Structures are given as C-alpha cells and as structure tokens.
C-alpha cells in the first residue's frame, strides 16, 4: 500500500522497498590531533553507478571540534500518512560544541548543503541543556535528548524544535528519578517512551585517553 508520507507503514513494507542508492555518514577528527572540521560524507551505494562504493561528497561543518554524533531526520515513519511531510533535512548534533547542524539533503541528495545552525550557546540560554545526543521526530516537530544541563551536569533533558527548526523549549515536564540522559525511543500507540542512561558531559569533557 503506497502512501505519500515518509517512511513505511510497517517493517514488511520497508523490506519491499527499493535498495538505497546513497548513504550518509559522519566523519570526525576527535582524538586525532587533526584540526579540521568534522564532515558529513555521501557514499554512492548504487552497484550500477560508476562511482559505486566511493565517497562522492563531503560537507564540512563550519567549526572545529563538534564531534558529530547520532543524527536523525526531520520526519520519520510516524508521519507516514501525512503527505505534507517528507525527509528533507538531517539534524547533526555536535556533542562537544552543543551545536545542531541542519543539513538539506533534498535540493541535491548527492551534495547535501548546510541549511541552518542552532548555536549551542542559544540552546544553553533558552533550555539549559548541553551535550546533544539522539534525534527523533514527533509528527511535525523534533525532539533531541541531551546528556546534561548548561553546566554539563546530569541528568540533562529533551529539547523540542518546531518544523522550521526554532527552539520551542524543554519537551519533558520532569526528569523524575532519571539520573543520566542518553538514547530514547517512543511508542505513541502504547503512550510510553523508553530511555537509557550513559553519563553527564562533564564526565568525558575534557577527557584524556591516558586517564582510562
């Protein structure tokens, strides 16, 4: 059953879909001593293409030391039935810089371009959060887990963005007994969200491998 929205209505439908022809992955320089910006690499995975298995584009971030981490789409399978939604943007958090990089993958999928940056200082000021980690969509909006508050202390929280990537504010009412932030996923039909724990930003920033 076809639909105009993003994603697929079920795992079975996703299995039937055509193979991807492009892959996006991040490349970072954290811990290498190399003072260059992290970048988003576009990889050609179409076996019929002359550039098959090659990195065909690199989108460098404007700054140095972001440590790009998990990334996510602006829209996902939860809006599969909404024809007004589409996967146009990737959100790339910098876990060290606290910046959120919004990347346009729709204009030219083979050469993504930077659409917007949400500065980490703005996030600290408006939402008291740092250490962005996991990106998931909530219908037309986006939620991002953070490992710490503006001072880098646990437990962090969740930042909500609108569809135009403006800061709405904190998504959660309370972190309750949660001691640390990390990854998460939600099941709207069951009215639950499951999160896991890792560490506060101050635990690993700064960090030297000689201390491990």
Predicted regions: what is each one?
Residues 98-100, 151-152, 158, 202:
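Structural signal for beta-propeller blades
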